Curated annotation (Swiss-Prot):
The species this protein was found in: Homo sapiens (Human)
Keywords from the named record: Leucine-rich repeat, Phosphoprotein, Repeat
GO biological process, one term: intracellular signal transduction
UniProt protein name: Leucine-rich repeat-containing protein 40
Claim: Signal is one of the keywords in the record: no
PANTHER family: AGAP008170-PA, INSULIN-LIKE GROWTH FACTOR-BINDING PROTEIN COMPLEX ACID LABILE SUBUNIT
Segments crossing the lipid bilayer: none
CC per GO annotation: membrane
LRR repeat residue numbers: 83-104, 106-127, 129-150, 152-173, 175-196, 198-219, 221-242, 244-265, 266-286, 290-311, 313-335, 336-356, 400-421, 426-447, 450-472, 473-494, 496-517, 519-540, 543-564, 566-586
Lineage, broadest ranks: Eukaryota, Metazoa, Chordata, Craniata, Vertebrata
GN (gene name): LRRC40
Chain positions found as Phosphoserine: 71
Length: 602
């Protein structure tokens, strides 16, 4: 009955008179017919300069196929059509929309991104069921006040427009959860924004903001706040009261001081690189109990406090391009997976150690803690034993640091004496890197109940044997610079593995078994011959945050990879694909993922 009521008062001959002629070839009748069944219509990338009238009237006019069959017994019952709920008209040449938009009151999704729109019609207020509105990549200078009538709106994407201010009454969008205002010309954020109490994600990056309102702390559900690339000189202390905040991006601003976060106990990532921060103190660190990523690159830091050891959960620390001359040795006791130090005038760590990577730097710092302990004469007897090969195994490292280290010996096998030295001690890390190993040492199996980190990089491994696959507590595995072209399916049993480094090997595809290790957070597989990845399987890897595919043979990047929204670092340089263009890659992971998502066919 609702359908008959809707067309009451309309010219019932409208569908016969204009239904087909108005659309011409721009919208095939078959597409409209399918849309009446599914409630979804995708007209993206059709070079449209205006929306055909038959689209606005899809649920009003009698369809053309009614000419051929008016029988109530027909299989195709056009009068039982579904209201259009999803309309995608992105990637066209639209300069305006008409008020006929009101003829689609059932819309829940309207996607008109990547057009040439300078305004939105006031009739948009009548789309009261709208939940997602994407108007990004247009030329909007202002938003109509009527947009505040969309009380069911949950996602609003306005990035890459020419907005200079926010409409009055914007705070009435009380159900809004995801708001993207990045890449506009905003100079202020109204205090009334704080009334957006349902907001979970707010992107204000690449604007001209000089300050944030103190009232921002009322956004009690906000988890993701991106203020990169603005003109912020200070952060309101009230921001420290945002108890749900997990990700905070403040890169490329003019901050001179790092804010304190006494109530942000859930904060996992803090990005404050490319500012003018001169000092890092204990007060800045002591409340960051959950922090996993701390980005302080390109600032003016001169030192790192000993209290850095308080960040027990820290995994990635970027200190590159500062004025740091020394590091606290206690930094070596953190379980970092990534430590960037380039561009600092460090006097206490040789450049060759830094060039060997994170684990070598941490190992060096730990060794300096040891050097500050027993005297040299004591350590000669306590920390090493001589093997038949005249090499030494560091007993002190086994006992105090729980590391079995037999690296940089150019050995073709690991002597039994190395494993014998463990005795009844607990060992959590194995470092057999920089040798000539052609196979996994079989006696590693003896340590399967305790080892979490294994470094077998810079060897001559051409296959992985089952000895490695039984290390069920393994969280970190470094296999770079070997001769590997595959991984065994049995590696699926490594149910705690978080980081794997396969760079500089001979892989032609991402090993299938990796898609089934759902605990993986970091995959480094640069400098191989990888020709493809499976975005559908990768989307299932919900913990994956870092994927390095640089310098491979990728001829194309599947748009569906953009759905891997948990990725924080996606590196694609040095591949032969043409799109995304280099300019997109330079904008970083978020821009790459957005670019890919915008090109997913629907």
């Amino acid at each position: 009955m609702s359908r008959l009521k809707r067309i009451a008062g309309q010219d019932l001959r409208a569908g016969f008179k204009a239904g087909g002629r108005d659309c011409g070839t721009s919208v095939p009748q078959g597409l409209l017919k399918a849309a009446r069944k599914s409630g979804q219509l995708n007209l993206s990338g059709r070079n449209l300069s205006e929306v055909p009238q038959c689209v606005w009237r899809i649920n009003v006019d009698i369809p053309e196929e009614a000419n051929q069959n008016l029988s109530f017994g027909a299989t195709e019952r056009w009068w039982e059509q579904t209201d259009l709920t999803k309309l995608i008209i992105s990637n066209n040449k639209l300069q305006s929309l008409t008020d006929d938009l009101r003829l689609l009151p059932a819309l829940t999704v309207l996607d008109i991104h990547d057009n040439q729109l300078t305004s939105l019609p006031s009739a948009i207020r009548e789309l009261e069921n709208l939940q997602k509105l994407n108007v990004s990549h247009n030329k909007l200078k202002i938003l109509p006040e009527e947009i505040t009538n969309l009380r069911n709106l949950k996602c609003l994407y306005l990035q890459h427009n020419e907005l200079t201010c926010i409409s009055e009454g914007f705070e009435q969008l009380s159900n809004l959860e995801d708001l993207d205002l990045s890449n506009n010309h905003l100079t202020t954020v109204p205090a009334s924004f704080s009334s957006l109490s349902s907001l979970v994600r707010l992107n204000l990056s690449s604007n001209e903001l000089k300050s944030l309102p103190a009232e921002i702390n009322r956004m009690k559900r906000l988890k993701h706040l991106d203020c990169n690339s603005n003109l912020l000189e200070t952060i309101p202390p009230e921001l420290a009261g945002m108890e749900s905040l997990e990700l905070l991006y403040l890169r490329r601003n003019k901050l001179r001081f790092l804010p304190e976060f006494p109530s942000c106990s859930l904060l996992k990532e803090l990005h404050v690189g490319e500012n003018q921060i001169e000092m890092l103190e204990a007060e800045h660190l002591k409340h960051l109990n959950s922090i996993l990523v701390l980005d302080l690159r390109d600032n003016k830091l001169k030192s790192v406090p000993d209290e850095i050891i308080l960040l027990r959960s820290l995994e990635r620390l970027d200190l590159s391009n500062n004025d740091i001359s020394s590091l606290p040795y206690s930094l070596g006791n953190l379980h970092l997976k990534f430590l960037a130090l380039e561009g600092n005038p460090l006097r206490t760590i040789r450049r060759e150690i830094i060039s060997k990577g994170t684990q070598e730097v941490l190992k060096y710092l730990r060794s300096k803690i040891k050097d500050d302990g027993p005297s040299q004469s004591e350590s000669a007897t306590e920390t090493a034993m001589t093997l038949p090969s005249e090499s030494r195994v560091n007993i002190h490292a086994i006992i105090t640091l729980k590391i079995l280290d037999y690296s940089d010996k150019q050995a073709t096998l690991i002597p039994d004496e190395v494993f014998d030295a463990v005795k009844s001690n607990i060992v959590t890390s194995i470092n057999f890197s920089k040798n000539q190993l052609c196979e996994i040492p079989k006696r590693m199996v003896e340590l399967k109940e305790m080892v979490s980190d294994v470094d077998l990089s810079f060897n001559k491994l051409s296959f992985i044997s089952l000895e490695l696959c039984v290390l069920q507590k393994l969280t970190f595995l470094d296999l770079r610079n070997n001769f590997l072209n595959s991984l065994p399916e049995e590696m699926e049993s490594l149910v705690r593995l978080q980081t794997i480094n396969l760079s500089f090997n001979r892989f032609k595809m991402l090993p299938e078994v990796l898609y089934r290790i759902f605990t993986l957070e970091t995959i480094l597989i640069s400098n191989n011959q990888v020709g493809s990845v499976d975005p559908q399987k990768m989307k299932m890897m919900e913990n994956l945050t870092t994927l390095d595919l640089q310098n491979n043979d990728l001829l194309q990047i599947p748009p569906e990879l953009g759905n891997c929204v948990n990725l924080r670092t996606l590196l694609l340089d040095g591949n032969p694909f043409r799109v995304p263009r280099a300019a997109i890659l330079m904008k970083g992971t978020a821009a790459i993922l957005e670019y890919l998502r915008d090109r997913i066919p629907t």
